[in-house]
Amino acid sequence: MLNIRHLWVLGIWELGETNLFILQSIIAVGMGAFVIVDRAVAVYFIWGNFELTTLVLLITFIGGSGVVKMAVFVHNRRQYHSLANQLDELLSLQRGSCSEDPNLAAILASSRRKAARLTKGLLLLMLSQTLLWISVPLVAYPEESRLPFVQHQWDHNNKFYEISYIVQSLSAVWVSQISLGVDCLFAAVMILVAAQLEILVHRLLNIRNDVDIVCKETAILEKKELDSKSDENMYDELRLCIKTHQDILRFVAFLQDIMSPIAMTQFVMSVVITCMALFQATYSEEFSAVLKCASFLTIPVGQLYLYCWAATNVTAQAEAVSAAIYSCSWVDASERFKRALRLIISRSQKPLVLTAGHLYPIDKGSFLTMKKPARK
């Protein structure tokens, strides 16, 4: 999986303990520590300058969000490994159905491509934005010793300027890639889960009584035998669908527990950063400060929307499962089939909604609601 390989390169996902991975982990921890210390010291020395302090705090919160998510991820590393293993098991449940039906196979393949393209696109976008920020001082202020993110007011950037520039740049790239990489991992998982629910919808719709298509000339005795076999096949397929549905719900519950702390961190940080950026953009008299604040908004808002969009797809497909149940050939089915059908009906009636911190629903409605206070 592309997301796992990416996080392994950054030193927070272990694919076998090697000297290389230990070095990668040390670099990740070092970059995270530098981001916190460098930003905190910078805020201390400029405290009292409203506009400059607000701008540095924005940078601090963005970097701090990545460091917090990295710390949570590393602390719960075994649970994330378990999540990956359970996802593989979940994808294998309907592999047989996908191999028999090209349409189902196309849904699965499309979800994998979507997850990979989304991950590549967003990570490259984040990298390009970070590199743009890194290059601004060299292009806009070539004669001044200015650092890309926060300035060292205590020595006016005179001491260790080159080293400070390089470390600030590397730490920004490393931490931002970790922050968005974790978000893309969860988004990719939710895309694959939504695809599994969509495949289940098609399987439920395909449950039908084959006797309905038997020719009228078929003998009555033969028709009864076919009816018995068809009912048995319908019941067996329904049992498999119920088991798959239960396995998907269990996986989503586990995903909820794993994702909740990081999603809550992203929600809180996104709201704080958005409010601070809009506040300074509104009251600042310098146009350059307004542009800087506006450029910051794309990062937290984009990360927040990523969660809401992916989780909404899961909820929508879960609702589609409920609708598909009533569309299968249950009217002329046996009582045994109808009793089994009640199980999946009763469970699918409860909305499948992911939450941040087990408190706030993650969906597009919540995204719009959280943006309203920031615009006021």
Language-model segment annotations:
Residues 35-38, 62, 82-85, 89, ...:
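Generic structural signal for well-ordered, non-membrane alpha-helices
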Residues 42-47, 71-79, 248:
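Cytoplasmic, membrane-proximal interface of class
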Residues 62, 85-92, 96, 198, ...:
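Short amphipathic alpha-helices and their capping/turn residues within compact interaction modules
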Residues 65, 69, 175-178, 182, ...:
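A broad detector of the eukaryotic-type serine/threonine protein kinase catalytic domain
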Residues 69-88, 186-188, 194, 198, ...:
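Inner-leaflet juxtamembrane helices
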